[in-house]
């Protein structure tokens, strides 16, 4: 990883392509016009406690899966709904099944993952704007006065996003282990007596999405590059098709931190490898 970054940094700025697309933009599904400009990564709002946030989500019809300490004085609430689960049950789309609400008890704000942003990134050509815009509207109804984050990306670039030349796309997953779905889930839950499993969401007989804690040393990168986006933790693991996989950290971190520069990414160059080591352990 470090060698790759050194090589990338040595080339001209023209080699940078953080918003590169892979494939043509598709027409909006469901008869609802898709955004034509930038889409915010998060919806930010005034501080409320984690318990109050959970109550609001449940009242709006969302299913709260867990509340996880993602950073010191900060909690991530993982939540879903029938629409997200149905979309996540489609082949290679499990990551879209869960949205996150980060409660920052230090800076007294909340941040919610934007279903339109992550929906387009994870669903790609199968994205249905009518569905994901309704999920977003339901969130905004439950949490009035939310504002778009400064973190954002052009909607048309989300489906084919990768950080730069040589970096992975969404589909370039890391295989953590192989076996039956039941065997892989059991391994994840038996490791450390299940202490690192933040949530478990069954999407079909063959597919389950886990939220998994990283090691204490590994997860410090969040505070280094910006605790405001700590909702990316716990790390998602997909168990499907006889494999446990994770989206590559170079992709997941850059998607969650679209304002991250090459120099800032270079400052956490060892993190992608450390994440693989952490998440490989349960499946050995």
What are these regions (language model features)?
Residues 208-284:
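A cross-kingdom marker for long, charged
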Residues 75-114:
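Mid-chain, structured segments of secreted extracytoplasmic proteins
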Residues 16-25:
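Bacterial Sec-dependent signal peptides at the C-terminal "C-region" and cleavage site
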Residues 1-4:
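Positively charged n-region of N-terminal signal peptides that target proteins for export
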Residues 110-147:
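Hydrophobic alpha-helical segments and helix pairs
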Residues 8-15:
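Bacterial N-terminal signal peptides
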Residues 26-71, 124, 144-208:
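Terminal, regulation- and interaction-focused segments at domain boundaries
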Residues 60, 79-83, 91, 95, ...:
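Charge-dense, helix-prone N-terminal extensions
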């Amino acid at each position: 990883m470090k060698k790759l970054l050194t090589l990338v940094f040595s080339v001209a700025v023209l080699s940078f392509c953080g918003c590169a697309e892979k494939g043509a933009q598709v027409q909006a599904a469901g008869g609802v016009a898709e955004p034509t400009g930038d889409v915010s990564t998060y919806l930010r709002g005034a501080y409320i406690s984690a318990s109050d946030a959970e109550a609001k989500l449940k009242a709006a019809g969302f299913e709260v899966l867990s509340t996880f300490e993602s950073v010191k004085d900060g909690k991530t609430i993982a939540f879903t709904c029938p629409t997200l689960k149905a979309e996540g049950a489609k082949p290679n789309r499990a990551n879209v099944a869960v949205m996150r609400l980060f409660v920052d008890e230090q800076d007294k704000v909340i941040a919610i993952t934007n279903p339109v942003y992550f929906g387009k990134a994870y669903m790609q050509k199968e994205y249905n704007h009518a569905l994901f815009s309704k999920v977003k509207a339901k969130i905004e109804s439950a949490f009035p006065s939310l504002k778009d984050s400064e973190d954002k990306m052009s909607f048309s670039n989300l489906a084919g996003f990768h950080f730069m030349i040589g970096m992975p796309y969404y589909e370039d997953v890391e295989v953590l282990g192989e076996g039956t779905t039941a065997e892989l889930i059991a391994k994840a839950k038996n490791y450390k007596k299940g202490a690192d499993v933040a949530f478990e969401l069954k999407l079909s007989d063959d597919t389950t999405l886990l939220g998994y804690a990283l090691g204490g040393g590994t997860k410090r990168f969040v505070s280094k590059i910006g605790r405001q986006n700590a909702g990316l933790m716990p790390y998602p693991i997909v168990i499907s098709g006889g494999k446990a996989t994770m989206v590559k950290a170079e992709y997941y971190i850059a998607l969650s931190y679209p304002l991250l520069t090459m120099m800032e990414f270079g400052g956490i160059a060892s993190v992608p490898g450390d994440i693989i080591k952490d998440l490989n352990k349960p499946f050995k």
